[in-house]
Design a protein with these regions (language model features):
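Membrane-embedded alpha-helical bundles that constitute the cytochrome b-like, heme-associated redox core
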Residues: 2-257
Length: 257
């Protein structure tokens, strides 16, 4: 048994190619760490938060509206992640990333993903005004669901999911190009599997609640509630449906200040 564990550990720490040596320059190592931290961990977590935690567990919705915890986590988390990714880009700026076909694809797709991340940040900045209930004025691009807001939501949501998905491919190519140790491949694969499982579970539970309802409630007369939600797999509830689905088993209801 001891010999098996020893052999398995040796196998784990060998490069993917099976070579007995694994030497990469410092800038390659730090580039990889920055990109895995950003695109492999922080940005996917930000997507999960924005999709499934607009109404947090225990929140007494619709009596308590516009819970900004998800918004702050998404904004600050994605901002930090993008800065880390840009540091990773600077580490390889002007350097030879390799001439093989996988290295070339890694470079091209990497620039596409980086550009998508910057575009996401710019689109968030240009999303338009919000409107009540916590703003000074009830009217706003979001409250009224103006054409500008509809365009922003379609662009931001679609590009966000595509960018994170493409980043998985780019990270996998980076591991191949760097001939990374096998444990890195397995660790990243397990992490992505865990993220996918949590995503599927929360989606099945109906936790992807419409942003408009999370902020303004289920009143069917409101502008955003008179149209279909933008995006796929988004749930809407009235007060009774929400209470039955999410609050029935709670012995204590938490009001979000």
């Amino acid at each position: 048994m001891g010999a098996f564990i020893h052999d398995f550990l040796v196998w784990l720490f060998l490069p993917m190619s099976g070579s007995h040596t694994h030497e990469v320059s410092g800038w390659v190592s730090w580039h990889g760490r920055a990109m895995v931290l950003s695109w492999g961990f922080l940005l996917p977590l930000g997507v999960l938060v924005a999709r499934f935690f607009k109404v947090t567990p225990g929140q007494n919705w619709p009596h308590v509206l516009d819970n900004k915890r998800w918004w702050r986590a998404h904004l600050y988390g994605q901002s930090v992640a993008l800065l880390v990714a840009l540091v990773g880009v600077l580490l390889v700026w002007g350097r030879n990333g390799g001439t093989g076909v996988w290295a070339q694809w890694h470079g091209v797709l990497g620039w596409v993903v980086t550009g998508s991340g910057v575009a996401q940040a710019l689109s968030g900045w240009a999303r338009g005004s919000k409107g009540g209930p916590t703003d000074a004025s009830l009217r706003g691009d979001h409250f009224d669901m103006t054409p500008w807001r509809k365009g922003f939501e379609r662009f931001h949501k679609c590009l966000g999911y595509l960018a994170v998905t493409a980043a998985c491919v780019v990270l996998a190519l980076g591991l191949v190009v760097a001939d990374a140790p096998r444990w890195m491949v397995l660790a990243l694969g397990v992490w992505w599997l865990a993220l996918g499982s949590v995503f599927a579970l929360l989606q099945h539970q109906g936790r992807c609640i419409d942003t408009y309802q999370a902020i303004w409630g289920p009143n069917p007369r409101l502008p955003g509630n008179r149209m279909a939600p933008i995006g796929w797999g988004i749930s809407r509830y009235d007060a009774a449906e929400f209470k039955q689905r999410f609050m029935a088993k709670n012995t204590k209801k938490e009001d979000i200040p």
